[in-house]
Amino acid sequence: MAKAVRIHETGGPDALVFEDVEVGAPGPGEALLRQTAIGLNFIDVYFRAGLYPAPSLPATLGMEAAGVVEAVGEDVTDIEPGDRVTYAGALGAYAEARTVAADRLIKLPDDISDRQAAAMTLQGLTAQYLIRRTHRVAPGETILV
């Protein structure tokens, strides 16, 4: 069992519930993480309020975190137990532990803390997307990131 922040219905902050959840073994292509830091993002408010629909309810909120790989499922070759990793874009981060698709995981170098990784991964990927895909920044242009 792990503690998680979940919603059983959409709404305001009072919809958040802190409860025990069952965390199973990782399936093929998945990793089991012990999460040590979790990012807080405005998109989490959208899911809580129902502006972005969760795939099902109850739902565990949160889109990014960092932690330590505890176990891996079949066909996982790039990540192994003991690796420090971060990820973004996978709903369910507000939990002590969880399974996540291993191909979403990014190994962390020693000079980036778990807290730093959990606070910057989603924002960094968003900034990269905006300056590489939405508007290709040209030499001489000024941007604010």
Task: Label the model's feature ranges.
Residues 1-3:
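Extreme N-terminal starter segment of soluble prokaryotic enzymes
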Residues 7-15:
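Extracellular beta-rich ligand/substrate-recognition surface
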Residues 17, 29, 63, 102, ...:
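Exposed loop/turn and edge beta-strand positions of beta-sandwich/beta-sheet ligand-binding modules
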Residues 22-39, 49-92:
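Glycine-rich beta-strand-centered segment in the early N-terminal region that forms part
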Residues 43-46:
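Cytochrome P450 core scaffold surrounding the K-helix E-X-X-R motif
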Residues 84-145:
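NAD(P)H dinucleotide-binding glycine-rich loop of Rossmann-like/cofactor-binding domains
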